Amino acid sequence: MEELVGLLRIRVKRGINLAQRDTLSSDPFVVITMGSQKLKTRVVENNCNPEWNEELTLALRHPDEPVNLIVYDKDTFTSHDKMGDAKIDIKPFLEVHKMGLQELPDGTEIKRVVPNRENCLAEASSIVSNNGKIVQNMILLLRNVECGEVEIQLEWIDIPGSRGL
């Protein structure tokens, strides 16, 4: 069995202007996958601007493994409708974490990541110091859908005794 590097906590905050998949609205939920790990939020019924505010934690063994986010519309009698997807680019976040800058004053911006073809950012994203931790807030532009964004926050959790990053 491969050794854990650490834990990646993803706070799935909210959806913004998600696509309508049912008659009047949608019943969205988020699925995050990394390798064989698959985590999901609760369903928010009848809402194209849902507030999840849920923490999903992935065990990281391979820092280069892609992290994917997919939004679905829950359907009771048929398969769930896909409402878009995004790749979460964690590389800049992990690079900053390796610098060991957790002791900076709260709110200090360490790095700014701009949208490009390699990430799904809707706007520039800041990696900042927050209560002795490094966090990154992002708004992801969903792909393969007519509209929609998802706001998330990344946070790294060290595991005592692990090899770390």
UniProtKB/Swiss-Prot annotation:
GO MF, one annotated term? phospholipid binding
CDD domains under this entry? C2_ArfGAP
Sequence ranges assigned to domain C2 in this UniProt record: 1-106
* Binding residue positions for Ca(2+) 1: R21, D22, D73, D75, D81
| Localization, UniProt | Cell membrane; Nucleus
What Pfam families does UniProt report for this protein, alphabetically?
A: C2
Please, which domain of life does this record's source organism belong to? Eukaryota
- Keyword field contains S-adenosyl-L-methionine: no
Binding-site positions, Ca(2+) 2: D22, D27, D73, K74, D75
Q: How does it assemble?
A: Binds to PYR/PYL/RCAR abscisic acid intracellular receptors in an ABA-independent manner, both at the plasma membrane and in the nucleus.
Residues modified as N-acetylmethionine: M1
For biological process, the GO terms are: abscisic acid-activated signaling pathway; positive regulation of abscisic acid-activated signaling pathway; positive regulation of GTPase activity
| Role description | Stimulates the GTPase/ATPase activities of Obg-like ATPases. Mediates the transient calcium-dependent interaction of PYR/PYL/RCAR abscisic acid (ABA) receptors with the plasma membrane and thus regulates ABA sensitivity.
Q: Which Gene3D superfamilies match?
A: C2 domain (2.60.40.150)
The similarity comment for this entry is: Belongs to the plant CAR protein family.
Q: What is its main location?
A: membrane
Keywords attached to this Swiss-Prot or TrEMBL record, sorted alphabetically, are: Abscisic acid signaling pathway, Acetylation, Calcium, Cell membrane, GTPase activation, Lipid-binding, Membrane, Metal-binding, Nucleus
Q: What is this protein called?
A: Protein C2-DOMAIN ABA-RELATED 7
**A single cellular component GO annotation:** mitochondrion
